[in-house]
Design a protein with these regions (language model features):
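Histidine-centered, transition-metal-coordinating active-site segments
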Residues: 1-22, 32, 36-344
Length: 344
């Protein structure tokens, strides 16, 4: 963010010290509302509250403690500040967070297709009518960025093994929530118990913000280790699978898996593995994942040409496949235990 702001200032864009501080604070705090395991468990822990709502609540609480020092950061975060480009640097289809995590995750996952010209893109940023734009000579870098984003989602973030593990994690929390709701003795930290019992759903965010802030991955990891020996066969089986990386097999398809096939495989799980019907439903299930890599109906990535003409990358690009770029991609998954692969 600091580098992007400096590039804009060097090009004559007026950004005050207060605005720079506000934008940097906004980008540092904008994901503060993510809980353990980030997006994977966003709807499994603090149900009914998005991470954006939590981020704003944290920022407002900090602002009270800091005597209003974050007023500008909050305005930028909420897109209520007149210099729209500052919000776009924090949250848009070309925000610095996306640039950062694509660059970082490509490196650490070893997926070369996710590599982007980060420095080049930042140097091509400009402002026109208070909106963030990209100079025309940066169009190829933006094309590569969008292609890299698409590749990273389907090769890394939504890889079938990731989908299978993530769905197992969600199912484990769901089963634990059911047991806690039935008053079945189930080990949890006091913080995790608060959310599994649904108490947060009955109280305002501000009243449980400190409890949420105390949660981290270890609350979940320790619980899963303990639950591996829980008397409930469903919870213990799922936790042992995750602990020992005996992950469910996941199939991905461009078409939905038929209810008949899912029902058939569930029946095989019951017959060959001796599982109850509810247990089979936890280890054999189908669903879908979707992703949109670029939405021309939202704030567009605009390219600035020499005659001051602005054009959406969607139409300005000669290389990108428009239908593949703009359409929401939906893929269907089907998860089941590897042990029954011989019978299906």
């Amino acid at each position: 963010m600091a580098q992007a702001l400096q590039v804009l200032k060097d090009k004559g864009v007026t950004i005050s010290q207060e605005e720079e501080e506000g934008a940097i604070a906004a980008i540092l705090l904008h994901d503060l509302g993510h809980g353990p395991f980030s997006h994977s468990l966003e709807h499994s822990i603090a149900r009914g509250t998005s991470h954006e709502e939590l981020s704003l609540a944290f920022m407002q609480q900090l602002n009270l403690e800091m005597g209003g020092r974050l007023n500008l950061a909050i305005a930028i975060f909420c897109n209520q500040y007149h210099k729209k480009f500052l919000h776009q640097l924090v949250s848009s289809q070309l925000d610095v967070d996306r640039l950062d995590y694509l660059h970082r995750d490509s490196f650490f996952s070893g997926v070369a297709e996710g590599t982007i010209g980060l420095e080049r893109i930042i140097k091509m940023l400009y402002v026109s009518s208070d909106e963030l734009v990209v100079e025309a000579k940066g169009i190829y870098s933006i094309e590569k960025f969008l292609i890299a984003r698409r590749m990273m989602y389907w090769q890394v973030y939504l890889h079938k093994t990731v989908v299978g593990a993530e769905q197992m994690l969600i199912a484990i929390l769901q089963r634990a929530r059911e047991l806690v709701g039935q008053d079945v003795p189930t080990f949890t930290t006091s913080r995790l118990h608060f959310f599994l019992s649904g108490k947060n759903e009955k109280e305002p965010i501000a009243s449980w913000l400190d409890i949420f802030a105390g949660l981290d991955d270890s609350d979940i990891s320790i619980a899963i280790k303990e639950w591996a020996t829980h008397p409930d066969p469903i919870l213990s089986d799922m936790c042992r699978r995750l602990n020992y990386r005996n992950l469910l097999h996941a199939e991905l398809s461009g078409t939905a898996f038929s209810p008949e096939r899912v029902k058939e495989v569930k029946a095989i799980c019951q017959e060959k593995m001796g599982l109850s019907e509810p247990h089979a439903g936890y280890v054999c299930f189908a669903g879908e994942v979707t992703n949109s890599f670029y939405n021309p109906k939202q704030e567009a990535i605009k390219i600035l040409f020499k005659n001051n003409r602005l054009e959406d990358i969607y139409t300005a690009s000669e290389m990108l496949n428009h239908s593949a770029l703009a359409n929401t991609v939906k893929k269907y998954f089907f998860c089941y235990p590897k042990e029954i692969a011989l019978w299906i």
